[in-house]
Design a protein with these regions (language model features):
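Short beta-strand->alpha-helix junction loop in the catalytic core
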Residues: 1-9, 37
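Donor-nucleotide binding loops and adjacent catalytic segments primarily
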Residues: 12-98
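Short alpha-helical segment that forms part of, or immediately flanks, the ligand-binding pocket
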Residues: 92, 110-116, 137
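Acidic donor-binding loop of glycosyltransferase active sites
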Residues: 93-109
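Flexible glycine/serine/alanine-rich "lid" or loop that lines and gates the nucleotide-sugar donor pocket
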Residues: 96-97, 115, 141
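Short hydrophobic beta-strand element within catalytic cores of glycosyltransferases
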Residues: 101-103, 119-129
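C-terminal "capping" alpha-helix adjacent to the active site of nucleotide-linked donor transferases
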Residues: 140-143, 149-166
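C-terminal amphipathic helix plus adjacent low-complexity
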Residues: 165-208
Length: 208
């Protein structure tokens, strides 16, 4: 998966300061919740279930262009600290502030999270797109996160994720993955072009 170079860059601000800027705390596990460019109603369920639980964490919701969803998440009180963002090109900055990712098993979001050493919590069921189901299996096989049948299971899944030994293991496994395609592919293409140019025979006019 080719990712934007910004997902490999060093943080632009220190984590404690970044969290404080969002009104969040440095002493709580932080999840970034992202469901593509238009968000998902599942984000409301995740917010409600975790808020009603006894888990101690905080949430960064990225709702994309779904302003109605963003407004719904901003309205009303919440037991858990949260920050709600709409559309942004700074997903990498929010991921730098997080400890893990919650979302769908799309190749883009999962690859971005893992590039930043974030373990993932994703769902996989009959409604999951066929091309995304393998990603969920891959997450389990590589032990880089938790796969749910539905987000009704989010509370125990988060409990498992934030258990210190599990989080450390998942993060170590995520950090061991190397996806440098954005930097490697241009060089590979250049080599292919060079070989192609060398293999082309000089043009010879066709005799009539």
């Amino acid at each position: 998966m080719i990712l934007h170079p910004r997902f490999y860059e060093a943080p632009v601000e220190e984590r404690v300061a970044g969290l404080a800027r969002l009104g969040l705390r440095a002493d709580l596990p932080t999840a970034v919740v992202l469901f593509g460019g238009y968000g998902s109603q599942a984000m409301l369920e995740i917010a409600e279930r975790l808020d009603d639980s006894k888990r101690e964490l905080q949430l960064i919701f990225i709702c994309g262009r779904n302003e109605k969803l963003a407004s719904a998440l901003r309205v009303g009180g919440s037991r858990l600290p949260r920050f709600v963002e709409g559309f942004t090109k700074d997903v990498n900055r929010y991921m730098h502030l997080a400890d893990f990712f919650i979302g769908k098993p799309g190749p883009g979001s999962v690859s971005e999270a893992l590039a930043m050493k974030l373990p993932v919590i994703v769902s996989c069921n009959a409604w999951t797109l066929p091309q995304e189901r393998y990603n969920a299996t891959w997450v389990l096989e590589n032990e880089v996160g938790v796969v749910l049948r539905s987000f009704s299971e989010i509370v125990p899944a988060v409990g498992r994720m934030i258990e210190p030994a599990n989080l450390a293991r998942f993060r170590a496994n995520a950090g061991g993955l190397k996806n440098r395609a954005v930097f490697e592919i241009p060089g590979m293409l250049e080599q292919i072009l060079e070989k192609s140019e060398k293999s082309v025979e000089p043009y010879a006019a066709v005799k009539t």
